[in-house]
């Protein structure tokens, strides 16, 4: 299986990354099949080879989570709603509604006592 992942390079504590296509069993900094882009997390600079990335994605290459977010920002992939995020938002909304109801109940009970 071909993976799209980040390959680290640069000085110590000043890492930059190349976006590469490689075999899923190869090492992080091993020899890639193809270099597809560049990402610098300090300056947020991103360069993508869009044609080569589209070809690799149509061939079935699987991007890692970080590469997926970079491709979403670059417009190559649609933003995918991850289930854990959607569940977390729904849970927060339910908690807000429950708090509002409990505050209403407290204010009603205080008015009844007066």
UniProtKB/Swiss-Prot annotation:
It comes from the Bacteria. Disulfide bonds: none annotated. It holds the Pfam family Ribosomal_S16. Keywords: Ribonucleoprotein, Ribosomal protein. Coiled coil: none annotated. One of its GO terms (molecular function) is structural constituent of ribosome. The keyword Ribosomal protein applies. GO terms for cellular component: cytoplasm; small ribosomal subunit. The keyword Ribosomal protein applies. GO terms for biological process: translation. Belongs to the bacterial ribosomal protein bS16 family. This is Small ribosomal subunit protein bS16.
């Amino acid at each position: 299986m071909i993976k799209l992942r980040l390959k680290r390079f640069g000085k110590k504590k000043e890492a930059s990354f190349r976006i590469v296509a490689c075999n899923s069993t190869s090492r992080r900094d091993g020899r890639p099949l193809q270099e597809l882009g560049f990402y610098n997390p300090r300056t947020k600079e991103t360069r993508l080879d869009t044609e080569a990335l589209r070809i690799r994605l149509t061939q079935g290459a699987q991007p890692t989570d970080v590469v997926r977010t970079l491709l979403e920002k670059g417009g190559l992939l649609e933003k995918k709603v991850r289930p854990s995020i959607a569940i977390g938002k729904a849970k927060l909304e339910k908690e807000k509604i429950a708090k509002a109801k409990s505050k209403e109940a407290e204010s009603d009970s205080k008015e009844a006592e007066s």
